[in-house]
């Protein structure tokens, strides 16, 4: 008798066909790995039942190393070989690191554009290699849990990570032996864990307050489509700042000062413990050994809330900016997802609830929520959930464009554009007979190339010689789902094409991105004036070049008086071009254009006469 195979709808009847895929939160201080088990996402523990893996690697002689808790215990005794928080160095050069002399590492100077590296007893190590060690440790944990090889992983990155930092993360995954299914933004992963689990739709805010940074993302969920419509934050604000304020306040109340680095560290540690105590109680003890003496102070939650209220307000200011970018009011937000251990502070919970007029979603562990969301996405990308129809649309943190004549930026893809995306724009040549075009790809919010960041340069050659402005070159920008950029240029008539994949050797820090955004807002008026001046000068140069070329070729057809008038207009434009008045340059350019209209008509008539010379009416 034949037996029928029965399985749950949407699931394979063969359990061995299930692909093991995990989500990884590669964090600055701690990392986690999660997977969907028995229909629910959960973080995977190590052999001792611990979920968090400290993002620390210690290198030892003869190729030996310690990872995680074992390495963390050796930070003080072997600081030079114990590499901590290397996520901050991913995709960054040595010149991008603030005060490298204050860090215990022996940084290795490299070529301009090289990613920073550190000298250890086991040789020179890059942040990519260190991150790969952490990823490999998490991969082994997952494989031990399931007793089989992984199919792939989804890894989360900060929303502000640029091309170089994302590429460095992809390289680390490959080095760790992981099949990278996708990179997704951390707030997006958190939203997946909440929004999809609860079958919610609408507009949501993801409020992510970690130890060192604050990120806010505005997302729209509609029929399974998750779209990030705005991002923002403060890369110099986190739980550590709350610790610092509390430590300084406590020492002032005690009437003492922390002079040495050891005393300052002790005060910070005591402040953090006190802050964590105030999460669950109305008062907690600040206790530290300062200057060889034990000091103690009872701290009330109300005092802590009062002295740190300015920090909390800074997070809300960033939220307001993100809402403006999304063109939304706070009343449009259906729910708020809380991410990061610092959101456990009661004052944060109250402030967010009061701002949005709704209680934030906090039923998931804020330390784990990012990894859980990544696991859900990995589960679907591995094909284990055919019924899942989720689509993620992240956004670009800074505008992308190319340099045009005069050092101006022509934006192709604007900030907060959803990805993956592709945008194209047509350009032309500036000079007669131009057969090549240099493409300079830049990133930023300013109007001048000098104020933006250079990403790549390449050339399109083989353009047919034509009059200036006749050629048509289509420049196409494509950004994939991982946020990596490709740029191509194609001459339309011949099909000749050139392309570059933008993988800069190091990228922008969160601080630099935030600074570039702030400068873009603060200098908008100045940039508009500068752009108008440059555009006026470029048009003046084009008009002067065309006039000189025409005079050299056909100046003999001009009556002496008309030639003199044109020369006067040319001299006037040349003189005013050196001034800083865009409107005056425009006026002089238009005057020259009007003054050469009759000359242009005579040139056209001569050209027609030359073309018809020697031909009969019948032959035409």
From Swiss-Prot:
- GO MF entries: ATP binding; ATP hydrolysis activity; ATP-dependent protein folding chaperone; unfolded protein binding
The protein's UniProt keywords, in alphabetical order, are: ATP-binding, Chaperone, Nucleotide-binding
InterPro entries tied to this protein: ATPase_NBD, Heat_shock_70_CS, HSP70_C_sf, HSP70_peptide-bd_sf, Hsp_70_fam, ISC_FeS_clus_asmbl_HscA
Q: Which Pfam families match?
A: HSP70
Q: Give GO terms for biological process.
A: iron-sulfur cluster assembly
Family of the protein in this entry: Belongs to the heat shock protein 70 family.
NCBIfam families referenced in this protein's UniProt entry, alphabetically: HscA (TIGR01991), PRK05183.1 (NF003520)
Function field = Chaperone involved in the maturation of iron-sulfur cluster-containing proteins. Has a low intrinsic ATPase activity which is markedly stimulated by HscB.
Supply the name of the protein: Chaperone protein HscA homolog
Organism per entry: Paracidovorax citrulli (strain AAC00-1) (Acidovorax citrulli)
